[in-house]
Swiss-Prot record:
Coiled coil: none annotated. It comes from Rana latastei (Italian agile frog). Keywords: Amphibian defense peptide, Antibiotic, Antimicrobial, Disulfide bond, Secreted. Its main location: secreted. Belongs to the frog skin active peptide (FSAP) family. Ranatuerin subfamily. This is Ranatuerin-2LT. Has antibacterial activity.
């Protein structure tokens, strides 16, 4: 359903934001 799509998009955004944060902290 639509909620599943939104949840998936939110998860992807969260994951990429987490990756960027990790890069800032650990320098990738």
């Amino acid at each position: 359903g639509l909620m599943d799509v939104l949840k998936g998009a939110a998860k992807n955004l969260f994951a990429s934001a987490l990756d960027k944060l990790k890069c800032k902290v650990t320098g990738c």
